[in-house]
Regions:
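Extended hydrophobic leader/signal-anchor segments used for secretion and membrane insertion
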Residues: 1-207
Length: 207
């Protein structure tokens, strides 16, 4: 995404100006709340930990698998296993597909799949914070403290990329870094007290 955007920005005569719209905070997304204000979240080998304790996975959680099928999936099998046309659109008998644990077991037991392997995600580039250089992935992420109203954190250049967006965008502060020092509203600081509570939302499709 980043490389593509940079290429387009550098070739405006060919692609034209980039036009954006303000983010609509009223847009609705259905996600599961897995982290509350003041909690510390970490993902280790795809399992979510809250304050150091493993979180029970939803029964219908999905992960992406690489499949080699012995046959094309019939419509009734897809419906039974909760596989949609969008999931299978690019798959003939070989490819990637999000599946529940139940679907994986059924495909194996019925001999429909010759091989199923979990797709392990080592991509660091499309992970929040994008400019953090923290080497986090979807499978192994954090730990990250979820801000709580009235709670303070020590701000450093290392953790600033994590909290820069809520401090600047959601809480309306001017934030700058000058000569290795952090300034909020033109005042040098090493701490910040949050004005709002934040929540960690995550979908059941964790591909």
């Amino acid at each position: 995404y980043r490389l593509g955007r940079e290429y387009i920005e550098k070739n405006r005569q060919e692609f034209g100006e980039i036009i954006t719209r303000p983010t609509d905070r009223r847009e609705n997304y259905v996600k599961r709340c897995v982290g509350l204000p003041g909690q510390t979240l970490q993902i280790k080998d795809r399992i979510i930990y809250i304050n150091g304790e493993a979180n029970k996975e939803p029964d219908n959680v999905q992960y992406t698998y690489h499949l080699k099928l012995n046959q094309r999936l019939e419509d009734d099998v897809m419906k039974e296993l909760g596989i949609t046309m969008e999931d299978i659109m690019s798959l003939n008998t070989l490819g990637f597909m999000p599946l529940t644990n139940h679907a994986v077991e059924e495909l194996k037991q019925r001999g429909i799949a010759e091989n199923i392997e979990l797709n392990r995600d080592n991509d660091e580039w499309d992970i929040y914070p994008l400019n953090g250089n923290l080497h986090w992935t979807r499978d192994n992420y954090g730990p990250i403290w979820i801000p709580a109203k009235g709670e303070s954190i020590d701000l450093t250049l290392e953790n600033l990329p994590i909290y820069e967006r809520p401090i600047r965008t959601y809480e309306g502060n001017k934030l700058e870094v000058k000569n290795g020092k952090i300034f909020i509203n033109d005042q040098e600081t090493t701490k910040y007290t949050f004005k709002l509570d934040y929540y960690w939302m995550q979908g059941d499709n964790r591909s």
